[in-house]
Amino acid sequence: MSTKMTNKKEVAIDAEQSTANQVLREILTGSPVRTLLSILVGFLVGAIFMVAFNPEVLNAMSYIFGRPADAFAAMGKTISDGYGALFRGAIYNTQASDFAAAIRPITETLRFAAPMIMAGLGIGLGFRVGLFNIGAVGQMAFALIGVTYVSTRIELPFIIHSLVAIIVAVVFAGAWGGIVGYLKAKTGAHEVIVTIMLNYVALNLFTFFLRTPGLLLEEGGAGTPKSDPPAETAALPNLFTDEYRLHWGLVLAVAATFFYWWLMERSTIGYRFRMVGFNSSAAKASGIRVERTFVWAMAASAAFAGLAAANQGLTSVGGVTPSIHANIGFDAITVALLGGSRAGGIFLAGLLFGAFKAGGPAMQVVGVAPEILNVVQALIVMFIAAPPLIRALFRLPQPPKRKPISEIGRASCRER
């Protein structure tokens, strides 16, 4: 009787996993055309919001029938001012007095993009295995406990100090993520629920360590949760002069992107990850230990979030605070979705969202509310996550349907 119940439970879990994997494949295998159209629609809707709430446009609309040219001119000026400010704040400042100041925006975009790329790679890895890792924020927080301790409490030589801190961050985050994989493998607990709950645990643990004397609280601190700045031997140095804040975190992000590509596309373990993500039942039948794969996949996914934590912790000039994670773990979900969980796509998506963060303040200067840019980001992700919607809007063709694994196997047997 118990064996039958166990078999029914396994069938139900496999069915749930298969449905989730089908949804993920539909989202992640979208064409570049659909991605570009999603971005375009997001910017168009953002332009509508800018126009709809601009006082000059509303004033011109009051007499549009008498002088329609004024209304259209006000609309054009509002949109060009808004997105022009985004360009100047994120790519190249055409109003700067010298070249060094003009290229500062692109360095800020790269600086903001680096941690989102690294965390996005981790989320994307989980997606490729059919796992929804919603816990990158908690994994970063737990990793920050280790990286902050190493960078502020331990003395090591230059370069070695940074490397040890990065390794500790990866190990801490990987262990925290491995807990999720273990619980899923042994108890069937859903990774979404577990990661959300562990986010709270890790964030509160991190704050407790920052608030407690003798742990991570800064020397002479009065109880405000804040650590000392990382030691000079541990801090990631700037890539260029002190005029720019871009640091070696960008190099770390590029290296992580190449490693992710090799891991998922060329390595044996990456092949197992993809097999389990495509069809866990078929993977199990072929001899792959699915439960063990879940554990390793969640650990690897979290390890990339640990790199993002190292990026944040080793560049905090004023010391680490509880908000240093900056919700990068949640932004990474959108980056992974937009990038289709592929290495190159995630890198480009990280650059786009880094540009949003770098250019947002410039848009506020010209009167565009920051919430409008958030709406643009949300709409882009919504269209990426709802393929039928963007196909209906632009009348794109339906993607070819994949044959089930069982049918492919029967067909190959008949040919033999």
Predicted regions located by residue number:
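Helix-loop-helix "hairpin" substructures at the membrane interface of multi-pass membrane proteins
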Residues: A175, D242-G319, A343-G344, L348
